[in-house]
C-alpha cells in the first residue's frame, strides 16, 4: 500500500530525517511536535500552558496539511518533563479533541529545552 508524506507551511520544519505527517491505509501519523515556531526556535522558557498550546497548535497544523484536524485523532502520545503538568495539559487538550476521546498515553520524559512533546494518529475515514 502506498504512503504519502506531507509537509506544512505552518508547522515547524522537521529537525531531522522525518516527515511532519505520513498517511498509509487511511491513517495519518503525525510526528511529535514541541513548542517550536516555524523558524525552529524553541519556546521552552515560556509557562507550561503557553508551551502546551503552541505544541497542540503545531500538531493541528500538521493534521490540517492532510485535510484533517485533531478531532480525527484515534491515538495521542504525550511526553511531559514534569508529570505535575498533566492536569493543566488535559484542560487545554480537551479544546483540540472530541468525544469519544482518543486513546492516549502520557509519560514522563527527560525532554531538554522544553516541557512537552505530543504526537498523534488520525483516522481519515471518520
Where do the language-model regions lie?
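N-terminal presequence-like segments and the immediate start of the first folded domain
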Residues: 1-57, 61-74, 80-126
Amino acid at each position: 500500500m502506498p504512503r504519502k508524506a506531507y509537509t506544512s507551511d505552518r508547522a515547524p520544519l522537521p529537525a531531522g530525517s522525518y516527515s511532519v505527517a505520513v498517511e498509509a491505509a487511511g491513517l495519518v501519523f503525525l510526528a511529535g511536535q514541541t513548542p517550536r515556531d516555524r523558524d525552529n526556535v524553541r519556546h521552552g522558557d515560556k509557562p507550561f500552558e503557553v508551551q502546551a498550546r503552541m505544541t497542540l497548535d503545531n500538531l493541528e497544523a500538521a493534521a490540517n496539511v492532510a485535510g484533517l484536524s485533531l478531532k480525527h485523532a484515534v491515538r495521542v502520545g504525550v511526553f511531559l518533563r514534569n508529570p505535575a503538568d498533566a492536569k493543566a495539559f488535559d484542560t487545554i487538550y480537551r479544546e483540540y479533541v472530541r468525544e469519544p476521546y482518543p486513546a492516549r498515553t502520557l509519560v514522563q520524559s527527560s525532554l531538554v529545552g522544553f516541557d512537552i512533546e505530543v504526537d498523534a494518529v488520525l483516522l481519515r475515514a471518520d
